[in-house]
Amino acid sequence: MKRTIKYTIPEDFDGKKVIAYLRGEAKISARLLKSLKTVENGITLNGEHIRTVDILHTGDELKIEIPCPDGEIEPMNIPIDVIYEDDDLIAVNKSPFLACHPTHNHQGDTLANALAYHLKNEGKQSVFRAVGRLDKGTSGIVICALNKHSAAKIPKTAEKEYLAVVSGKTEKFGTIDKPIYRPDPMKTLRAVGEQGDRAVTHWETIATDGEKSLVRVWLETGRTHQIRVHFASIGMPLVGDGMYGTDEMKLGHQLLHCAKVSFVHPVTGERMTLEAPMPEDMRKIVDKCFGE
């Protein structure tokens, strides 16, 4: 299968080279461009094969065909909440009880398997290219790119906002700037330590009852378990987080939800914002503790 993208050349690129448009205007990565040169009809101009050094003229139709090979993920009929879908990406509101991709503990019951099934039924490729994965136990928006171009472009413009319920009473605003490292390479556990990589987390308190706080969180960096590790490091672990705190309420997952993602569409150039509601158990706790 292939994803075909067509461009009509504007006046300001009249007389310029194909590569100037593809790299400068269409933002095609150097890696993908190199790949397209080896594909039959990977790059054509007005229906004819061309070189990237050839000259463009106003009104020309430039077309690229991006190969979309099938993946090796086994399709599984698992219900998912699709909140947006087009030819270049699909966005899902992930359940906290669903892992993003297969591991030794989860071979067939993952978001990747569910998306493979969904996309197969729609006649689309099923290579799993998640743009920022979420931990099992974290709910919310996961974007999956449907081709190499989308996979290269979306992460460069994506901005995420999370909602979290943390233990204790937080200040109105706060920033945690502490490096994070992996103490044991055989385990997923992370910790704060000077030998780690830079990690910065910002938050704003939405509501608090003195014992718990609902916070809006956004990140400067994207370290594994960053939000969970950072709040635990200041004595305010996420409610339900059995790894970095305790799960006294027996929720089975931390109350952390990716509620909003904003990004520039890889083909149209439109700034898009997607939002997703909290899972039911998190919503009930938020309503009970902080009001509706």
Task: Please place each PLM-identified region on the residue numbering.
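RNA pseudouridine synthases
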Residues: 1-292
